[in-house]
């Protein structure tokens, strides 16, 4: 049996707003979607797709999975996220190979921006 990772599903209250944020940030077009849901990409794409699923209320507590997004310039990446409605948490980690900052999307889902040297 051949198994393959096809995507990540994100629970959202405002599916349209959150999916639009990620579509611009990752330059991923909207694909065929079910009513009320939004898919970025398609399950047959070479890259895993992002699926945005509606939920009635926000989850309390920290989610134990997050996305990592590589950028060419960390400061421009931070500015882009903020311009799209996201937020910089203030958490920054400097390593020999690069820098990682923790960001959130418009609903507070944490993710990392990374610039490698």
Where are these regions (language model features)?
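Vicinal oxygen chelate
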Residues: 2-13, 31-32, 39-53, 57-117
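Short alpha-helical
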Residues: 17, 47, 76
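Short, conserved, surface-exposed binding loops centered on an aromatic residue
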Residues: 30-31, 59
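Basic side chains
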Residues: 17, 28, 62-64, 92
């Amino acid at each position: 049996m051949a198994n393959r990772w096809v995507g990540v599903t994100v629970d959202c209250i405002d599916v349209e707003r959150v999916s639009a944020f990620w579509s611009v940030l990752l330059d991923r077009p909207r694909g065929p979607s079910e009513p009320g849901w939004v898919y970025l990409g398609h399950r047959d794409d070479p890259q895993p797709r992002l699926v945005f699923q509606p939920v009635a209320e926000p989850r309390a507590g920290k989610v134990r999975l997050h996305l990592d997004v590589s950028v060419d310039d960390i400061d421009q990446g931070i500015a882009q996220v903020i311009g799209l409605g996201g937020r910089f948490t203030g958490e920054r980690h400097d390593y020999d190979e690069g820098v990682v900052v923790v960001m959130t999307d418009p609903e507070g889902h944490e993710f990392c921006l990374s610039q490698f040297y």
